[in-house]
Each structure stands twice: as structure tokens, then as C-alpha cells.
Amino acid sequence: MCGGAIISDFIPPPRSRRVTSEFIWPDLKKNLKGSKKSSKNRSNFFDFDAEFEADFQGFKDDSSIDCDDDFDVGDVFADVKPFVFTSTPKPAVSAAAEGSVFGKKVTGLDGDAEKSANRKRKNQYRGIRQRPWGKWAAEIRDPREGARIWLGTFKTAEEAARAYDAAARRIRGSKAKVNFPEENMKANSQKRSVKANLQKPVAKPNPNPSPALVQNSNISFENMCFMEEKHQVSNNNNNQFGMTNSVDAGCNGYQYFSSDQGSNSFDCSEFGWSDQAPITPDISSAVINNNNSALFFEEANPAKKLKSMDFETPYNNTEWDASLDFLNEDAVTTQDNGANPMDLWSIDEIHSMIGGVF
């Protein structure tokens, strides 16, 4: 047993024979035998030799025409029509052809175009969609990143569309399809105006001003000796009243300013021009207390300034020089001897001359 079948009951199929034409077409030999018999009968019924002789006799011999005889070639080929090559015109489309398959295809394309033109967008603007709760969401696809960029949720569709336009211009530039192209035109016009304003030439200052101003600019400084500014240290020998004996003249008769502190004299300034310039006399400062004199020459705190004391009473330098001679020792000795011809002043007279201001 093999697989539940009884081998003794298994009958093998007969051995297949070689495939021949007789096996495929068994009636072929019968047809061949019948055709041979019919051919014999036909040959007996028809005499092919007699028929050939009859046909040959019935054939007309055209050799009677002699080629040497004169004959007109035009008469022979007179009935022959020449060949004419003409283009056949295209058949006009009839009313029946309008209902054909070709006509149906054309009408179908036109109908699709009309449908696409009449079809409205689901949303009025591109790149936005409405949420179930009423707000509008905007998003755009970035081809460089290959992903969609979320732009946010907005209350109105117009705000969402403007956000989409801004992102589209940033990603695709001037080729972007936007919802508000007129804003793009306005932005381009504004950029052009800004560029035009930047390209306008700026007025440059005239490097050569009028010659009159150049000539008159140094009139007041032509006799000034500009030197390096230095802090002035007191070099003058002050007496017990804090005033100088005489006034020296500067170069060319002009006086130099060298005071580094504010002063209350008639022609002093806060500008220091030279170390070698003579010091202007602080005549009106004669009555100031010696304790305050340190403020004039204190280098540690040069920013302190005293209040200006202006006097209306005029004075004369020659009178001051003459009045101060009594302080010298020679003047005292001559005064004792009574040989000084000059009238000496006392301290009370000095106070009255100053005006009684201490």
C-alpha cells in the first residue's frame, strides 16, 4: 500500500505513441485515396491534348502586320488617356460626423474646461483652512525641508491668507503665488523708492570756502604764540598784600594769557598760552586774605573758582607803582629823613581808593 491505495489494483496507462500526421488527421489518407481515384476518372473524361490544340488554333496571329510598313504611331496610342496626379480634397465634416466619436471627444474637453473654470475653491484663499470651532489655520510646504510649516491660527481668513503670503514670498521669492498680489507690487514700489533715495548724491561740504572768510579768520590770533598748555605754578614774587611790583610787556606789545584759574583782574582768562608769558597783575585781588591765596595755585584741585569781584572804580598802573614805594626799606629811610619829594599814601587812603570793599 502506498498512501492508502492498493498497488495491485493500480492499472498503468497505455504507452503513448509517437505523434504523427495520421494521429492528428486520421481522415487524411482517406481523402488522398479518393482524390487519386477522381483524378483517374477526370483524365479519362477530359482529353487535355485535344483542348490544347483547339486553343492554339483559335489563337489569332498578329504577325501579319509588317514592321516595315508606314503607320502612324498617334493612331495606335490615340485612345490612351494620360495619367493625371491630383490631390484629393478632404471631405467636409457633415452633420452626421458631429455625432461621431471625434465630435464627442471635443465636446467632452470643452465641458471639462468649463467645469474647471466654473468650479469654486473650497476656501477663498490658498494655504488656509477653517477649524471646526471657527478659527482659520495657515500652513505652507517648504520644498527645501520637504515638510509643511505651521504658520498659526487666526481669527479671520484674511489674516491667515496674509500670513501665508508672507511665508510664500520668503520661501519662493517673486515667483510665489499669493492671495494678495497687489501688496507685493506695493512692497516692490516702496523698495524701489528707498533704493532711489539711497542712490541720491548727498551734498558735500565745500572744501574751499570764500577767501574773505579764510583771510579774516586769523586776524585776532596773528600775534598769539600758541604753545602747549601746562599748569602754571606761581613764579611771581608777591609781597604781603599779594600784588606785583610792575607789569611787563609781552612780544610786540601784546599781553599773554597764562592763568590756569579764574581771576578777577581786568584782562585775565582761563586759557594758558605760554609758560614764558608775563603774568598779568591781579591788582583787584590785593585785599583778599592770604588764606584764600592757596586756592589760586593749588594743583590738587584746579577746578575750584572764586567768585568774580568786579570794581567800577578805574585805576592807573603808574599811581599804584608810585604808591607802593613806601613798602621798600629805602623809602622808609628817606621818609624818616624827610628827603622824599613824593607824597606817600597811607593804608586808609588805599582803602578809600579801592572803595571800602574788603
From Swiss-Prot:
One MF annotation (Gene Ontology) recorded for this entry: transcription cis-regulatory region binding
Chain residues forming the annotated DNA-binding region: 124-181
Signal peptide bounds: none
Induction text: Up-regulated by hypoxia but not by ethylene.
Record keywords, A-Z: Activator, Cell membrane, DNA-binding, Ethylene signaling pathway, Membrane, Nucleus, Transcription, Transcription regulation
Functional note: Transcription factor involved in the activation of hypoxic gene expression and in ethylene response. Partially redundant with RAP2-2. Acts as a downstream regulator in the ethylene signaling pathway.
Domain comment (free text): The N-terminus (1-13) is important for the regulation of the oxygen-dependent activation of the transcription factor activity, an internal region (123-177) is required for the interactions with ACPB1 and ACPB2, while the C-terminus (343-358) is required for positive regulation of gene transcription.
Protein name: Ethylene-responsive transcription factor RAP2-12
Taxonomic path: Eukaryota, Viridiplantae, Streptophyta, Embryophyta, Tracheophyta
